[in-house]
Amino acid sequence: MSSLHNLHNPTPGKDSVIHIGALLPDIMSTYGDDGNALVLRERLRRRGYQAEIIRITLQDDVPSSCDIYTMGGGEDVAQILASKHLRTHRGLFTAVEAGRPLLAICAGLQMLGEWFQVADGSHAEGVGLLDVTTVPQATRSIGELVGTPLTEGLAEPFLTEPLMGFENHMGATVLGPDARPLSRVKYGVGNSIPAGSSIPATGLVDAVSYTHLTLPT
């Protein structure tokens, strides 16, 4: 894996290196979610692209120059630390505003929102990239998840096939007026808002509910 040294910002192409920014894998990878960056790198390489993973830890500033970002989940304390770090080092905000995609898995979703409820019942401040809030469910949701893509309003409907994966979460996420759904749950629990709940996505911030694995179809 690459370090932050000599990081540049190429136009992605097969003759340039695509930099995958793995956000805070030192504290936000409780379930091995940093493996998403590994899978993404491998899939790019198999298609003839050069790709490197940039590990961005709590000791690093957050660069705005990566081509794509990934983030996993963690416990309450880790989420609070990560949220503060991303609010302080605002490279991710710059990158997202420039249209760089971000894949947030597990608790990475609730952390990107306005606030999320922690174990003692208090509200922890989120990063503020998504207009969502998260509270605990009565019971944990575990099992297969299938979602139907919602492409209305997207400049390029890049999703045409169902999203399939595995969900494992306690959180129930409510979308605010500025959050747009990526898909509607066909099978499974999803956000555990009423039946047919939505998976939020704003622009190219792909916060795929709490799905740990999204399967290509």
Predicted regions, residues:
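Hydrophobic/aromatic beta-strand patches that form the interior of the parallel beta-sheet core
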Residues: G21, I54, T70, L103, ...
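Cysteine-nucleophile active-site neighborhood
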Residues: D76-G153, T160
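Pocket-forming structural segment of enzyme catalytic cores
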Residues: D120-V208
